[in-house]
Amino acid sequence: IELTASTATVAEAAQALGVQPGMIAKTMSFLQGDQAVLILTEGTAKVDNRKYKDTFHTKAKMIPFEDVERLIGHAPGGVCPFGVPDEVEIYLDESLRQFETVYPAAGNDHSAVKLTLSELEQAANAKGWVDVCREIETPV
């Protein structure tokens, strides 16, 4: 989906697509030593540092803004799990499972793609599912 409106942030993407923010599959970029790792989460989810360390046996360290495009192949605002270097490891967070379809970015800050979770898992060539996000608090 190519859009005239920006999809660089979860809020912008949700508004441009007319969906709830959680349906935006947010792609977060981490470094584990020299290894670039992408984790796709539900749009409003936040990474829980303890869960991340328990899962990956290292502290959560985001890739510095200025290094994202060089290491991932996409600039911030358009980072997605498609068309990345083969050595980049990709994981899907359990927070996504509450939705049947999600909208990850598609390589730039004016794009998205609608996928079912199984389509996303296959298209992203994900190594697997992880649980590294905080529990999402439901408003009362």
Where are these regions (language model features)?
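Extended, low-hydrophobicity, polar/charged segments
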Residues: I1-V140
